[in-house]
Amino acid sequence: MKKPLRTSLLMLCLATPLAALAAGVDEAAIRATEQAGGEWLSHGRTYAEQRFSPLKQIDASNVRSLGLAWYMDLDNTRGLEATPLFHDGVIYTSMSWSRVIAVDAASGKELWRYDPEVAKVKARTSCCDAVNRGVALWGDKVYVGTLDGRLIALDAKTGKAIWSQQTTDPAKPYSITGAPRVVKGKVIIGNGGAEYGVRGFVSAYDADTGKLAWRFYTVPGDPALPYEHPELREAAKTWQGDQYWKLGGGGTVWDSMAYDPELDLLYVGTGNGSPWNREVRSPGGGDNLYLSSILAIRPDTGKLAWHYQVTPGDSWDFTATQQITLAELNIDGKPRKVLMQAPKNGFFYVLDRTNGKLISAEKFGKVTWAEKVDLATGRPVEAPGVRYEKEPIVMWPSPFGAHNWHSMSFNPGTGLVYIPYQEVPGVYRNEGKDFVTRKAFNTAAGFADATDVPAAVVSGALLAWDPVKQKAAWKVPYPTHWNGGTLSTAGNLVFQGTAAGQMHAYSADKGEALWQFEAQSGIVAAPMTFELAGRQYVAIMAGWGGVATLTGGESMNLPGMKNRSRLLVFALDGKAQLPPPAPAPAKVERVPQPVTAAPEQVQAGKQLYGQFCSVCHGMGTISGGLIPDLRQSSDATREHFQQIVLQGALKPLGMPSFDDSLKPEEVEQIKLYVMSREYEDYMARHKAAP
């Protein structure tokens, strides 16, 4: 007897993979996640970017039973900064070099991968590692920005490229590391590169066709040319001199965005000036709009509704690109639609997101560059001499910031914001008339001098901050900075990975340590959570990296700071186990010889190293472990130093040629500095030995 057709069709549907039946992601689906926590469809989970999940199967009472459900080894040796997305049983995430993978969330099986084949030498003009912070979903497509400035749409089922747009001028040192967002059918993407002399902008592309819809420049260009949009005419009045457009200006939109569908406002954060030192890029002062600002933009047209400048006339790399979070807070007995940000400069800002008016701003950590933010003017009250015009200064925070890109989260239940706080001093020196723009790290702020910051004064913490009272609720200290982002849940939990290689769960209300997992790799990314077949999971990309690990220094050489790249997925009663890590290779210590060159030659090498080499090989020649430590380079490497640096002998391995920027005598000075540092450190170790 044949089965009724109706029954046969039902069985066919049940047997069909969910991905094949999946409804496309749209605005309604993303907005629905505000109440339903099963899926994670956008970078910060919802348009508000709260990184809070209403899921509570895993809670403070049972999180001790959390275990590894499965893991996936990744062919990745650089930093993993992405927050995975989850839709209809599939995890979508990105790795270094802008590669994308889709993974079956139940089994951990790879479904497809896409490699945009970014040239490895592109890392030379990417300030902060070959990282990527994630992808976007819309309709039946996955979107990724690439390190070389492309925006690519992929088929969500197959990973095949559908369209690709070069969003930047490939002849200029732009890069993309941030995750795209999709708003009203438009893919929003920014870029980075201010340290190398670019002009910032944010663009919107049609999600279906890839056609450019609009572009908003964050700083003015050549005043002899027409302004691209009227906002730039007003911005130009806040710049001085006749060089700023030649130096790039900066203001890149390299990370944070949020969207309010009811107000129909897209919020984006802008970055630092190019170069950092205002005295060089805009002699005579000025606020330099729209650097270090929060912009509210109409997503249909790209028109500016309002702006708030976090750090006027920035001279310290105090970006406003840190996470923007939207919420409703009860302030003075009234509900307010607010925007919250804890940017690099160390003040926690609460703004009225309808008009950009400042509600409150207080220090959330050690801040010496400014006394306070004047609520009447919305401007910081700067400390004397903080702009280092006359003499070098040491101040807090540093260019790493009191909070960097590592995601914070807001829990509406506790009313607290969970911030990956870091305390690192900055050293700044005015290079002034001696500054020369080169194809290198152009700060004009004495970047090489930051090598003198000792590890003993560096620390980090998980900070629970009350945005209404503007004070800390609790704090968990860590031995160093550059810890991962946070996730908070309705289960009264906060999850965070650390630089030292642990994944933690704390109670969201009190900060009590409830659970810990040894991840075998430093973690910089933020966790996410999803539900599949009635079971809640927590996932994180574990892979040590990012700018702090490249610039290195003593504080980036703690135990656990390794890169063993994996996608880790946890659930209650998970039974999977990581294999034991391979033992570290034995180090053979060389007995170096003292450098007999003139001190001025070594000092010149130090300045050149700071500008050209430190961003990859580590400040003070102390590598963070991802890129070779030049103090330990072999005799053969030293012998062929000129060929490597100028002729590109190691270009296939990602070491670019600097023949367009350095002279042979300068390369020799760099080598002398490296050798002198090797000798200094060797003598210091043996002098300290018992």
From Swiss-Prot:
Endpoints of the signal sequence: 1-22
Induction: By 1-butanol. Primary and secondary C3,C4 alcohols as well as butyraldehyde.
EC category: oxidoreductase
Protein name, UniProt field: Quinohemoprotein alcohol dehydrogenase ADH IIB
Active site: 317 (proton acceptor)
Keywords, alphabetical: Calcium, Disulfide bond, Heme, Iron, Metal-binding, Oxidoreductase, Periplasm, PQQ, Signal
pH dependence: Optimum pH is 8.0.
Organism listed in the record: Pseudomonas putida (Arthrobacter siderocapsulatus)
Family affiliation: Belongs to the bacterial PQQ dehydrogenase family.
GO molecular function: calcium ion binding; electron transfer activity; heme binding; metal ion binding; oxidoreductase activity; oxidoreductase activity, acting on CH-OH group of donors; pyrroloquinoline quinone binding
NCBIfam families reported in the protein's UniProt record: PQQ_enz_alc_DH
Cofactor: pyrroloquinoline quinone; Ca(2+); heme c
Quaternary state and interactors: Monomer.
One Gene Ontology cellular component: membrane
Subcellular locations according to the entry: Periplasm
Cofactor note: Binds 1 PQQ group per subunit. PQQ is inserted between disulfide Cys-127-Cys-128 and the plane of Trp-254.
Binding site for Ca(2+): 195, 272, 317
Disulfide bonds: 127-128
GN (gene name): qbdA
